[in-house]
């Protein structure tokens, strides 16, 4: 039996971004029709299958995907009628395998088609800037310099904790 992969999604007024989390899977079928999208793929050890029944109709000819990387298949789907959907699926219930892709999410009031024109399917941003690539390069850059925060002479005025415990023992009381 095929496994249901985790699907991440984000939308713009005229399109939907989908990221299907699969482990080194080969795409065997990717088909859009009406308000449905069907994905089927397999890896060396597992078979994956997902059928999404969208909130509204899509343009089946516009379904595009990147070749699967080691972990994900990224898909873009044009909406037949540009409009913000209140949810991705027609069914109002929650499904455990569907999550919001906050890396690509944009609120309705933030939408600017000019920015989207330069956005790539792989999470790229306008003008070719890819935040994911930038962040991966930050790994060995070191942190900010917080000079002067090591020892503060004001701390010398504080009494030692041991002195307080000895005094409490003499008085026979504890705070």
From Swiss-Prot:
Residue spans of biased composition, Acidic residues class: 148-168
Pfam families, per the entry: CS
Region span, Disordered: 109-175
Consequences of knocking out this gene: Resistant to oxidative and heat stress. At increased temperatures, there is increased longevity and an increased propensity of larvae to form dauer. At decreased temperatures, lifespan is shorter. Defective chemotaxis in response to toxins.
BP terms from Gene Ontology: chaperone-mediated protein complex assembly; protein folding
Superkingdom assignment: Eukaryota
SUPFAM superfamilies xrefs: HSP20-like chaperones (SSF49764)
GO molecular function, one term: Hsp90 protein binding
GO terms under cellular component: cytosol; myofibril; nucleus; protein folding chaperone complex
Disulfide bonds: none
Domain CS: 2-89
Tissue and organ expression note: Expressed in anterior and posterior neurons including ASE, AWC, ASI and ADL amphids and phasmid sensory neurons, peripheral neurons and ventral cord motorneurons. Additionally expressed in body wall muscle, pharynx, vulva, germ cells and intestine.
Chain's role: Co-chaperone for hsp90/daf-21. Involved in regulation of longevity, larval entry and exit from the dauer stage of development and response to environmental cues, such as oxidative stress, in a temperature-dependent manner. Role in daf-16 and hsf-1 inhibition at elevated temperatures.
UniProt similarity note: Belongs to the p23/wos2 family.
Protein name as annotated: Co-chaperone protein daf-41
Species the sequence originates in: Caenorhabditis elegans
Source organism phylogeny: Eukaryota, Metazoa, Ecdysozoa, Nematoda, Chromadorea
């Amino acid at each position: 039996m095929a496994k249901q992969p985790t699907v991440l999604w984000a939308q713009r007024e005229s399109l939907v971004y989908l990221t299907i989390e699969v482990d080194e899977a080969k795409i065997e079928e990717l088909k859009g029709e009406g308000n449905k999208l069907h994905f089927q793929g397999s890896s060396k050890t597992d078979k994956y299958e997902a059928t999404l029944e969208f909130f509204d109709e899509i343009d089946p000819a516009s379904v595009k995907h990147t070749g699967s990387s080691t972990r994900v298949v990224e898909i873009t789907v044009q909406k037949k009628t540009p409009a913000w959907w209140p949810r991705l699926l027609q069914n109002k219930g929650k499904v455990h395998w569907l999550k919001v892709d906050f890396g690509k999410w944009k609120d309705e009031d933030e939408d600017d088609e000019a920015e989207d024109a330069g956005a790539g399917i792989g999470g790229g941003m306008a003008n070719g800037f890819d935040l994911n690539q930038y962040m991966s390069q930050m790994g060995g850059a070191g942190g900010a310099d917080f000079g002067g925060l090591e020892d503060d002479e004001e701390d010398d005025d504080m009494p030692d904790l041991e002195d307080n415990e000895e005094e409490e023992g003499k008085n026979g009381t504890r705070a």
